[in-house]
Structure formats: C-alpha cells, structure tokens
C-alpha cells in the first residue's frame, strides 16, 4: 500500500523541507518548523497538545532569527523558530495543524513519520551534541539515537496505527556519500553520511540534498 501521509517530527526543519523538495508535503503539521526531540514529541502526545497550545508557556526566544519566533518554557528556548503563536494568525495556524494532525492519526491510510538528527552540525539535541564533544564513537551515538527512536515508537503506537517511523541519523563532512538502512519492526533507521553538514533546513552542498531526496524516493516510492 502506498504511503498516504508524510509527517515530520523534527528535530529541526530539515525533514519538512525535504518532503517539500520531493513534492509529498501536501499539508502542514505541528512539528514541521520547530526545534524538537523525541522527549518533546512524547510529552506533547501524552499531554494531547495542551502545553503546546498554552500561551502561558510562550516567551521570547534565546536566539532571535526573525520577528516570527517564540520560545516555550517547557519544551525549548527556541521552540517556534519560524512562527510566533503569540500572534493570533500564527496561533490559529497551529490550531489548524494540531486538529489536522489528530485527524491524521485516526486515518487508516499508511503513514510515515520522520525524525532526523544531525547533532554534529546543528548542535541539537544538545545532549547528543555533547556526546560528539566528549569524543563518543559514531557507533555509540547511533546506539543512543536508536534507543530514542524506540522510546518514541513505544509512545506513538498508543495513538495511531498502520505507520512506519523513520529515524534519520545524519553525519556530515565525509569524503563520500553513503547510507545504511536497518528495519526493526516498523522502525526504519537510516544512517546518512553526507559530504556537507545540515543547516537545520537543507544541506550546505546541494549534492547532498539530491542524495537524500533520491534515497527517500527509492526507499518509499517503489512501485
């Protein structure tokens, strides 16, 4: 069965931008353009988006990118990085996104949720980036990210069905592009080795954008 719903879980904007690039991002969902990690997603799901939509948690960001930014005291200091839900229009945008997301969870069509980590280049999540700084091996970092994917899946399965969870683990500054795929039940782990680093939205070298997009089409659009 063809995948009908493509959903970005973050951890930055890169997955949403990639879905736009391959023309399968038809609608907006809550986590498209923000800072997240699996712990945030788990809490938002378990909390039914209550804190997510609670304006009392909103405040100034730590690193102001534009006027349309907003921090969240529970989740991340730069949580809303391209929207400002303290403004009515952006708040209504997130209301629509949340409603659409909840409706999608109830749909019977196949879903692909994507969580991408590029901690070496984006320094996010900070605890994984600290592993880089402390000299942890690539294998140890991958093991850590796989455990995070497993934890996320253990919560997600309580809210929806007929889905795959893709965990993209990106490592930049390699001499050549390569990838590895591992399927563990409905969790797909992609180790993505690129020439350049992620900016959080795209790769610095467009050859890597083409490589990533091509892999996604090859893995998830086979006839």
Segments (PLM) and residue ranges:
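Extracellular glycan-modifying ectodomains
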Residues: 2-223
């Amino acid at each position: 069965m063809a995948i009908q719903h493509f959903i970005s879980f973050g951890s930055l904007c890169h997955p949403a931008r990639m879905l736009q690039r391959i023309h399968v991002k038809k609608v907006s969902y809550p986590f498209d353009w923000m800072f997240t990690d699996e712990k945030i997603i788990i809490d938002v799901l378990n909390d039914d988006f209550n804190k997510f939509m609670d304006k009392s948690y909103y405040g100034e960001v730590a690193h102001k990118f534009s006027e349309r930014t907003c921090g969240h005291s529970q989740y991340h200091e730069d949580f809303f990085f391209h929207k400002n839900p303290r403004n009515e229009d952006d708040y209504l945008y997130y209301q629509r996104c949340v409603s659409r997301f909840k409706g999608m969870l109830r749909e019977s069509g196949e879903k692909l949720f994507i969580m991408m980590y590029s901690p070496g280049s984006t320094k996010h999540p900070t605890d994984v980036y600290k592993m880089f700084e402390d000299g942890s091996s690539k294998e140890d970092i991958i093991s850590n990210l796989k455990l995070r994917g497993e934890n996320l899946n253990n919560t997600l399965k309580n809210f929806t069905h007929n889905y795959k969870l893709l965990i993209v683990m990106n490592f930049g500054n390699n001499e050549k592009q390569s990838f590895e795929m591992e399927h563990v039940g409905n969790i797909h782990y992609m180790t993505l080795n690129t020439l350049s680093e992620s900016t959080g939205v795209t790769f610095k070298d467009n050859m890597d954008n083409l490589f990533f997009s091509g892999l996604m089409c090859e893995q998830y659009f086979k006839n």
